[in-house]
Curated annotation (Swiss-Prot):
Residues 948-960 have a biased composition (Low complexity). WD repeats lie at residues 11-50, 52-91, 92-131, 134-173, 184-223, 228-267, 271-310. Coiled coil: none annotated. Residues 1013-1076 bind DNA. This is WD repeat and HMG-box DNA-binding protein 1. It comes from Xenopus laevis.
């Protein structure tokens, strides 16, 4: 029964037109000279979807939802199907590509072009290319062996070549075609094809016939021809089962043969006699789509059905009838359900089974089915509906062409291993390119030219003061290169004649020999190289890293855990990435080692896994200009080593976010931390740039992938942590003895604290007080004071109280850390002085005694200044249950730490001892004046209750007290927190009673202070003068808040202004004349008199006070004020 020919329809303008079915067979896809790909749901579809791919489309292929096209822009492009979205440019030619095909599983493509080249490349990684050279004229067509071992190509030079893909060698050259100088002048485009699945034959159109060549012997074993063909055959196409071959000729004839019988089954003539330029079999049905050179599209149905419907002459029983029904059936939807089995009866001779055996490789045992007891129950073997029947012999799938019959048995092979990434050099373009970048880094650019005219290497420096440009003849065929400010390093692969070589051009050498070369051992191939500061390194196929000095001295050898992928260096650092195992499901399994090769050699990263994006590979590896390791994967994610978080990797930029199109990429050439930028080259429709014209470098900003980056909170968080990460390199540089920009570090810290304060204010507005406390953890002491002030002004007193407690803890930690630092420094200095000029023999002086020595020395130097503070602390410890002291390291450490802490918080000018006084200033008044400096911030954090009515029983306990920084106060009932959470004691009853009498109301107490002419601090004088302005701006503040506001304003004064107020306070004693001074008792005498001690023993009383510790100094001062008032 002849095939049914549908009426042809217009598809594209006049010119070469290509056609194929998609994998499911639901769509017809065509391309033509108008540069469009059209997707047809059927031949009658009046509104096909169009995808524009260029000016003209010469060829295309469709597989696994991807369309690869050869357009007039000389590029092989990839698009998604059926969306038609661009998915990248796989490769480029210098002229038009004439034919492009997929392999069987869709992982590779092959393309032949007019520049005589055939390229084979991976779809997922276009950098893995193989170039087949040998044709001397434009390539007409290419075809993959279904086993992916061979590739066949036809050319205008009159030859058909069979290539072995793995080693890019030509296995055979078949001079079968007529020669011509261009594709347009060729009598036939010679679309050859391999037999599906087995690949046993390759069909080649030769004149008016089709030659079949054997795969193994590459000899012509059969020639298919027919008198119906009067012009040269243009194209051949195999049925998916491999049993039928169809050919289209230049004069519009379509002929189909049965390969087993060599019989011609179909003869169809084009209605207008136009040239047939494309043929495609339906994957499931007996249909063939074809196009002509006028852009028309046609369809043939029921192709070769006459061959399968002849009854078998061998079998006549009922069982055989059922058997034939099982495999033949009348299910027309699955064309080869009956086709592949029934074709044997087409020829009634005894060689049927032999022919079938020759094609399948295994005879079918029909007796096994006939002898089965239940074989007569044939309907039980049929599947429900129109599904495919179960075929007992699984080898029949090699004969049955369509996937519906191939296997009913389901199986899972487990995760598929990912091919390992090949070694590469960072900043280089693929090796197969004739003009390529061997390296592009922060020092210079190395280009390689490898064509018929020249094979050379050019070295160009960004800064010509380093060295002038260098031109080298690439006689050794170097493929790897690196450049630094000291040398140029080159390496070549091993060949049959020469060993792999490492060549170094040491242009910074002071002698006349500026070049050296070393050969690798036999069989060892260099795969990666890099240049460090004073050393070079190369990684070889023997899983070794060889270290040389820059002058050529062999140094360390390092064994790798797996094959190297890439290597980079910066100064003394060397980073190596290698395969630590087999990856699965498209993922690479890479490990990384980071070594420091300076004087103190150490390994920082010990083969840790290298994190990559899903289904990606490493595309760039190196260091920032400041020396931090970083890398980029194929998805455009840039990651940096975060040394402050246990040497972890953090993503800092996504270059794909800046690409305009899906096929665009950025080719990274360098990264800087100050300023924060990625230097890269934009590549439109490709992954790497061409060498000419010279590409322009673009700059991309860093952007950490934080959540809610569009909100104000997310932006500030991202800015804070980005600044934190990129200011860490200064610590690393200073630790290793490099110069670092202190201004940069200060500016970064300033910006971080500003961001923290902004986030703190935002959280306060949102009533997120717990979040405010979390943000305060990162604040410095000064910024935390601002936060306390902001919280107080925002009427968030609980938050301010908690911030005060946190400030105490942080100050305590800071003081403790500084004290330990001083102890370590003094310990080192003490021992170095003892052993200066002598041997290092161990003695008792070498024991760890730094802590008591430090404490004794500190107490000896500061005994007089700290005397009054010690008495108050001891009194508090005796009269009250001790509070947890964060400074408590030993018996006397709290006193030392308390005094140091006061110094830290009272001044921003370094660690100055505010208690340092001369011997003539040891009066109680001055001692109390000194103690005031530690109590000002203490009183800032207190929020006293409002005084109750006069005469109430609670007046003595909760009465509003004037905040006097000169003396410590007793705790109120609720024990509110202070900024300085130091140990406070409950005073004895006598002291409390006298205090009540001495300070009944704030105005009177102030008058007493003025009357007694007690010395004031500079801050008190300033506060007295500026108190009205503070109250006018902030009405309703109580005394504690006034002092806090005053303290913040006083700190804003310059150091000179503060010093003036201090000097003014020291000179504010005159107010009494000499006579009054003689008449009036001295404060020490008043203290002794009020305590019942004789006046003449004042000095001895002071000495006795040291021993017996009667009362604190603050109590004595208040008692003296009380005694004077009573007079």
């Amino acid at each position: 029964m002849p095939a049914i020919k549908k009426n042809m329809r217009y598809g594209h303008p006049e010119g070469h037109t290509d056609v194929c079915f998609d994998d499911s067979g639901n769509f017809l896809v065509t391309c033509g000279s108008d540069g469009d790909i059209r997707i047809w749901e059927s031949l009658d579809d009046d509104d096909p979807k169009s995808i524009s791919i260029g000016e003209k489309a010469y060829s295309f292929a469709l597989k696994n939802g991807k369309v690869v096209t050869a357009a007039s822009n000389n590029a092989i492009q990839l698009h998604t199907f059926p969306d038609g979205e661009p998915d990248g440019i796989l490769t480029r030619f210098t002229t038009n590509a004439n034919h492009v095909v997929f392999n069987t599983d869709g992982t590779r493509i092959a393309a032949g072009s007019g520049d005589f080249l055939v390229k084979v490349l991976q779809v997922e990684d276009s950098t893995q290319q193989k170039t087949l050279r040998g044709h001397s004229a434009p390539v007409l067509s290419v075809s993959f062996d279904p086993k992916d071992i061979y590739l066949a190509s036809a050319s205008c030079d009159g030859s058909v070549r069979i290539w072995k893909i793995s080693d890019q060698t030509c296995e055979a050259v078949l001079p079968l075609l007529e020669k011509c100088n261009d594709v347009f002048n060729a009598k036939s485009i010679c679309r050859l094809a391999w037999q599906p699945k087995s690949g046993k034959f390759v069909a080649i159109p030769v004149g008016k016939a089709v030659h079949l060549y054997d795969r193994d012997s590459l000899k012509n074993i059969c020639t298919l021809s027919d008198d119906f063909i009067t012009q040269p055959v243009n194209i051949v196409a195999w049925s998916p089962c491999g049993q039928y071959l169809v050919a289209g000729s230049v004069d519009g004839c379509i002929v189909a043969w049965n390969i087993a019988t060599k019989a011609c089954l179909e003869r169809i003539k084009h209605e207008k006699g136009y040239t047939i330029c494309a043929l495609a079999w339906h994957p499931h049905l007996p249909q063939i789509a074809y196009t002509d050179n006028e852009g028309n599209l046609g369809l043939l149905e029921d192709v070769c059905q006459g061959d399968v419907k002849q009854p078998s002459a061998k079998v006549s029983s009922a069982e055989t009838k059922d058997y034939d029904e099982l495999f033949d059936g009348d299910d027309d939807e699955d064309f080869l359900n009956g086709d592949m089995i029934g074709h044997e009866g087409a020829v009634n001779d005894e060689d049927d089974d032999d022919n079938f055996t020759a094609l399948t490789g295994r005879p079918r045992n029909r007796g096994a089915i006939f002898d089965d007891d239940i074989s007569s129950d044939v309907p039980s073997l049929k599947l429900v509906g129109n599904e495919n029947p179960v075929v007992e012999d699984d080898q029949a799938s090699s004969v049955q062409n369509f996937t519906s019959v191939a296997s009913v048995k389901l199986s899972y092979n487990g995760p598929m291993p990912t091919p390992q990434q090949k070694p590469f050099q960072s900043g280089s373009t693929p090796v197969h390119l004739m003009h390529r970048f061997m390296v592009w880094n922060s020092v210079g650019v190395i280009r390689c030219y490898n064509d018929e005219q020249d094979n050379a290497i050019d070295v160009e420096f960004h800064d010509t003061s380093i060295h002038h440009a260098i031109h080298l003849t690439n006689s050794l065929n170097h493929t790897l290169a690196d450049v630094s400010q000291e040398a140029v390093l080159l390496a070549c692969e091993t060949t049959e004649e020469l060993a792999s070589k490492l060549q170094c051009l040491h242009f910074s050498s002071w002698d006349t020999s500026k070049e050296w070369m070393v050969d690798m051992p036999k069989g060892e191939n260099i795969q990666a190289i890099c240049l460090g500061q004073g050393w070079v390194a190369c990684a070889t196929s023997a899983l070794l890293i060889r270290i040389f000095s820059v002058g050529g001295v062999q140094k360390e050898l390092i064994s790798l855990f797996g094959p190297v992928v890439c290597m980079a260096s910066h100064g003394e650092q060397l980073i190596v990435v290698y395969h630590r195992g087999m990856g699965f499901d498209g993922d690479q399994c890479l490990g990384v080692q980071l070594l420091e090769l300076g004087k103190k050699k150490k390994q920082v990263l010990h083969g840790d896994p290298l994190p990559l994006s899903r289904k990606s590979y490493l595309s760039w590896l190196g260091f920032t200009a400041e020396g931090s390791p970083c890398y980029v994967d194929s998805e455009g994610i840039v990651r940096l080593l975060n040394r402050s978080l246990g040497d972890t990797w953090v993503p800092i930029c996504n270059t794909r976010e800046h690409c305009k199109g899906k096929s665009d990429h950025y080719w990274v050439v360098g990264i800087h931390e100050n300023p924060q930028q990625v230097r890269c080259i934009p590549c439109k429709g490709s992954r790497f740039p061409p060498t000419l014209p010279r590409p322009a470098v673009a700059v991309l900003p860093f952007n950490l992938p934080y959540c809610q980056i569009t909100t104000e909170k997310g932006q500030m968080e991202e800015q804070y942590w980005r600044s934190q990460i990129f200011s860490n390199h200064s610590d690393y540089l200073s630790k290793h003895g490099y110069e670092c920009d202190e201004n940069f570090k200060a500016e970064a810290q300033k910006m971080q604290q500003e961001l923290l304060m902004k986030m703190f204010a935002l959280s306060c507005k949102l009533e997120r007080e717990f979040r405010c406390m979390e943000l305060a953890e990162f604040m410095t002491q000064n910024v935390m004071n601002l936060a306390i002030k902001y919280a107080s002004r925002s009427k968030r007193l609980i938050l301010a109280q908690r911030l005060s407690e946190m400030a105490l803890e942080k100050a305590a930690e800071q003081a403790s850390a500084e004290q330990n630092e001083e102890e370590d420094e003094e310990e080192e200095d003490f021992r170095s002085r003892l052993t200066a000029g002598y041997s290092r023999t161990a003695t008792e002086w070498g024991d760890s005694r730094a802590k008591p020595v430090k404490q004794d020395q500190y107490e000896e130097n500061n005994e007089e200044e700290m005397e009054e503070e010690e008495k108050e602390q001891e009194e508090a410890l005796e009269s009250n249950t001790p509070t947890a002291n964060p400074f408590n390291k030993s018996v006397k450490t709290p006193d030392v730490s308390e005094s140091k802490l006061g110094a830290i918080l009272s001044s921003n000018q370094g660690r100055v001892n505010p208690f340092k006084v001369s011997a003539s200033q040891k009066s109680p008044a001055f001692a109390s004046n000194s103690s005031r400096s530690t109590s000002i911030l203490d009183n800032m954090g207190k929020f006293p209750r409002k005084p109750s009515a006069s005469g109430s029983p609670s007046t003595s306990k909760s009465d509003s007290v004037i905040i006097k920084p000169l003396a410590p106060k007793a705790k109120s009932k609720q024990g509110q927190a202070t900024l300085f959470h130091s140990v406070q004691a409950k005073p004895i009853a006598k002291k409390t009673t006298e205090e009540k009498k001495a300070v009944p109301t704030p105005p009177k107490a102030a008058a007493d202070i003025a009357e007694n002419k007690k010395p004031k601090t500079g801050f008190q004088l300033w506060l007295d003068e500026n108190r009205p302005s503070i109250l006018s701006e902030n009405a309703g503040l109580d005394e504690s808040e006034i002092i806090k506001e005053g303290m913040s304003r006083f700190r804003m004064l310059t150091s000179e202004e503060r010093m003036l107020w201090t000097e003014k306070a020291k000179g504010d004693y005159p107010g009494e004349d000499g006579a009054d001074a003689k008449k009036r008792k001295r404060p020490e005498q008043e203290n002794m008199a009020s305590n019942g001690c004789p006046q003449e023993n004042t000095d001895s009383g002071i000495a006795a006070a040291k021993k017996h510790k009667p009362l604190g100094q603050s109590a004595n001062n208040k008692l003296s004020a009380f005694a004077f008032k009573k007079e």
